Amino acid sequence: MAGTNKSYFHLHMISDSTGETLIMVARAVAAQYANVTPVEHVYPLVRSQKQLDRVLAEIEEAPGIVLFTLLEKDLVERVEATCKDMNIPSLSIIGPVMELFRAYLGRETSPRVGAQHTLNAEYFNRIDALNYTMMHDDGQHVEGLEEADVVLVGVSRTSKTPTSIYLANRGIRTANVPLVPGIPIPPQLETLKKPLVVSLHATPERLVQVRQNRLLGIGAGAPLPGRGEDSYIDSRSVAEEVAFARKLSAKYDWPLLDVTRRSIEETAAAVMKLYADRQRQHG
């Protein structure tokens, strides 16, 4: 309802695929309205009129904004007509983009036989990447590193795990290995040929800050990998860790990526660019 003073609103998202793109766009916009909370209703894999019946019935029960990514013309027209009858706003997220392509290319879209199978293949590829990434987190199962697309290395608290998971959600099989002074790196890491190895690093000051926050969260005295609590947050020790990681990265010619002021999304985007560049170089 236009001009509502409620602290929440219903946000309906309809997709004929996984709905990931739709959710990302919707949340990015909703985040700009800090005082209003969206109640999300996500309807993935909607590909028939029968499936749409259920969706439209739920929208009628809780009217709100309707966003959709549907390719079937009949489904699009029905969503738009029904929302108009209900007097609620609706918008195709891909419609304007397709119109832009159509105007620039001067041609209509051509039906792609098996296009949905391609979408399904991409979905299962992401699932496979996630499974691999979770199995190869924090230096686990190093014997399988050669099967990775990307291997992230770095000292503690350089966002290796969350970046790995983000990349896996893009279908990139990602392993991560911690670099700890005094502990030899896995021999498998020295002989990798297929994967791109990227070294994540941050300033000692930033690492100390992040690690102090972590200790506050888990409680003092919690076990830390390969070190005591004092050295974990000691400025000099952390600076030595950073220097150690840089020296190791130079030795093996691993590209360095500074994550000091980067969000997880920005770090992942930078890694994906390095990965894409490498793919092009290797044909």
Curated annotation (Swiss-Prot):
Known EC number: 2.7.11.32, 2.7.4.27
Keywords for the protein's UniProt record, in alphabetical order: Kinase, Nucleotide-binding, Serine/threonine-protein kinase, Transferase
Domain of life: Bacteria
InterPro entries cross-referenced by the UniProt entry: Kinase-pyrophosphorylase, PPDK_reg
Pfam (any one): Kinase-PPPase
UniProt catalytic activity: N(tele)-phospho-L-histidyl/L-threonyl-[pyruvate, phosphate dikinase] + ADP = N(tele)-phospho-L-histidyl/O-phospho-L-threonyl-[pyruvate, phosphate dikinase] + AMP + H(+); N(tele)-phospho-L-histidyl/O-phospho-L-threonyl-[pyruvate, phosphate dikinase] + phosphate + H(+) = N(tele)-phospho-L-histidyl/L-threonyl-[pyruvate, phosphate dikinase] + diphosphate
Functional description taken from the UniProt entry: Bifunctional serine/threonine kinase and phosphorylase involved in the regulation of the pyruvate, phosphate dikinase (PPDK) by catalyzing its phosphorylation/dephosphorylation.
Family, similarity comment: Belongs to the pyruvate, phosphate/water dikinase regulatory protein family. PDRP subfamily.
HAMAP family registered for this protein in UniProt: PDRP
Name of the featured protein: Putative pyruvate, phosphate dikinase regulatory protein
